[in-house]
């Protein structure tokens, strides 16, 4: 073809949703280049693979490109985007490029407000353990693979489906999981929860007639859309009517044990499961992977091994080990990407279950002024459930400040609620020192947020344990 695509350039290459697609395309034989505003471990890893990376944005970076891929985080006035349009080079949204990748395989798409990354990772791990060698594109680093993405030789591709910008409506999977539907990213849907629910129905109806929807019917909004879903459905959850149901759930030294009843069209023997993750929310995530395994006729032995040996995902209840505390003893440091009150509630409960009787210190950076405004009272409530709170200013993520939706306002409201006395840390750069100063022996310190707080745990480790490797991930 005269206009064959050989060289693809990514604007915002370091983003969690972009780097994986770029890596898979690179391994398919395309020439890949990309740029990002700041240097990162992701850019350095991609450069080591042979991908041409640039820090900063300039029109010259797209030289020779046949297509330019952008995410919704990239503004239309980006010089590389402007240059591409001037030169009539196709500018392709990230979701459309992901949809093109999915055309090469049988797609399994994981959607939902919370739990997408962990669920996608669990499904990927189950397929891999069964010898199906899936391709995957995940929004976090799968620890067992050391990457966000991999080009497999099998027939399946497992991907996250992003509802935040409605881009999941571009995907055409043959199997779709929806973990839950909650009010988040509501600006995309005109602050209309009904429109958000309808978008999920539309997403499910993107599947072919032989596709299967795997839905968590514990979630009220998913229950509400069920009458509108016309494709075959497998339900999962703790509810009595769930076709793939967990019972006898209990925490066990940072893991979860439970029994699974499988009644989705065919009665299979119950399974006694050990899941190498903490928290009941992760039991639900595992149930979706079990439902996928049933649909694909994956042997129980492979399924159980994958769940018991799961090595986790970067920034999802990621453990950094034991660190020396002021006054003697050690404290446990954990990082989690959760930044919505529902996610935070589940993660705090998981920490309580994994470390019973220990003081729980929450270090939290709110993400986006709009979310802080929309979920203000819920944030106050969930922070009040911790034993101590270190709270930073809001990570703007490109948004303009909103009156009374900033970190100080949130700290005042938590203080007035009277459950805990928060410590407000105005400068995120000071947070590592404040954590070190406030942590006592026996504490569990949980760093939560989707913004720049992601760099804090490693800095705490560097500060307190300079004589050992800088990071210990998971178990």
Swiss-Prot record:
Belongs to the MurCDEF family. It holds the Pfam family Mur_ligase_C. This is UDP-N-acetylmuramate--L-alanine ligase. It catalyses: UDP-N-acetyl-alpha-D-muramate + L-alanine + ATP = UDP-N-acetyl-alpha-D-muramoyl-L-alanine + ADP + phosphate + H(+). GO terms for molecular function: ATP binding; UDP-N-acetylmuramate-L-alanine ligase activity. ATP binds at residues 112-118. It comes from Paracidovorax citrulli (strain AAC00-1) (Acidovorax citrulli). Pathway: Cell wall biogenesis; peptidoglycan biosynthesis. Cell wall formation. It is found in: Cytoplasm. Its EC number is 6.3.2.8. GO terms for cellular component: cytoplasm. Keywords: ATP-binding, Cell cycle, Cell division, Cell shape, Cell wall biogenesis/degradation, Cytoplasm, Ligase, Nucleotide-binding, Peptidoglycan synthesis. PANTHER family: UDP-N-ACETYLMURAMATE--L-ALANINE LIGASE (PTHR43445:SF3), UDP-N-ACETYLMURAMATE--L-ALANINE LIGASE-RELATED (PTHR43445). Its main location: cytoplasm. GO terms for biological process: cell division; cell wall organization; peptidoglycan biosynthetic process; regulation of cell shape. HAMAP family: MurC (MF_00046). The lineage of its organism: Bacteria, Pseudomonadati, Pseudomonadota, Betaproteobacteria, Burkholderiales.
């Amino acid at each position: 073809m005269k206009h064959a695509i050989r060289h693809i350039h990514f604007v915002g290459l370091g983003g969690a949703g972009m780097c994986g697609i770029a890596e898979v395309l690179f391994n398919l034989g395309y020439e890949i280049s990309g740029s990002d505003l700041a240097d990162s471990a992701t850019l350095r890893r991609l450069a080591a693979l042979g991908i041409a990376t640039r820090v900063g944005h300039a029109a010259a970076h797209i030289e020779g490109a046949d297509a330019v891929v952008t995410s919704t985080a990239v503004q239309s006035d980006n010089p590389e985007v402007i240059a591409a349009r001037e030169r009539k080079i196709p500018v392709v949204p990230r979701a459309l490029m992901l949809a093109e990748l999915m055309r090469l395989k049988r797609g399994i798409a994981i959607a939902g407000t919370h739990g997408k990354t962990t669920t996608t990772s669990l499904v990927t791990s189950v397929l891999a353990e069964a010898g199906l060698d899936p391709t995957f594109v995940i929004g976090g680093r799968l620890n067992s693979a050391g990457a966000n993405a991999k080009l497999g030789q099998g027939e399946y591709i497992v991907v996250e489906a992003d509802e935040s910008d409605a881009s999941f409506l571009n995907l055409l999977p043959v199997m779709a999981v929806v973990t839950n539907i909650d009010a988040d990213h509501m600006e995309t849907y005109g602050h209309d929860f009904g429109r958000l629910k309808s978008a999920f129905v539309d997403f499910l109806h993107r599947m072919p007639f032989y596709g299967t929807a795997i839905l968590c019917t514990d979630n009220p909004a998913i229950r509400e859309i069920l009458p509108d879903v016309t494709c075959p459905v497998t339900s999962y959850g703790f509810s009595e009517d769930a076709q793939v149901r967990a019972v006898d759930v209990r925490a066990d030294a940072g893991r979860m044990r439970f029994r699974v009843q499988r009644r989705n069209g065919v009665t299979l023997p119950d399974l006694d499961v050990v899941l190498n993750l903490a928290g009941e929310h992760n039991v639900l995530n595992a149930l979706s992977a079990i439902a996928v395994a049933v649909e694909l006729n994956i042997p129980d032995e492979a399924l159980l091994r994958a769940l018991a040996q799961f090595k986790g995902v970067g920034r999802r209840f990621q453990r950094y080990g034991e660190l020396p505390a002021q006054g003697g003893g050690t404290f446990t440091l954990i990082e989690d990407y959760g930044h919505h009150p529902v996610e935070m509630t589940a993660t705090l409960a998981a920490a309580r279950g994994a470390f019973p009787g220990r003081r729980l210190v929450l270090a939290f950076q709110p993400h986006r002024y709009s979310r802080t405004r929309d979920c203000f009272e819920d944030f106050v409530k969930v922070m009040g459930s911790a034993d101590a709170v270190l709270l930073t200013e809001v990570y703007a993520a490109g948004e303009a400040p909103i009156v009374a939706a900033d970190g100080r306002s949130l700290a005042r409201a938590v203080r007035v609620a009277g459950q805990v006395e928060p410590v407000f840390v105005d400068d995120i750069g000071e947070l590592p020192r404040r954590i070190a100063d406030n942590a006592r022996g026996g504490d569990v310190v949980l760093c939560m947020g989707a913004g720049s707080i992601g760099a804090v745990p490693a800095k705490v480790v560097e500060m307190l344990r300079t004589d050992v490797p800088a990071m210990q991930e998971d178990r």
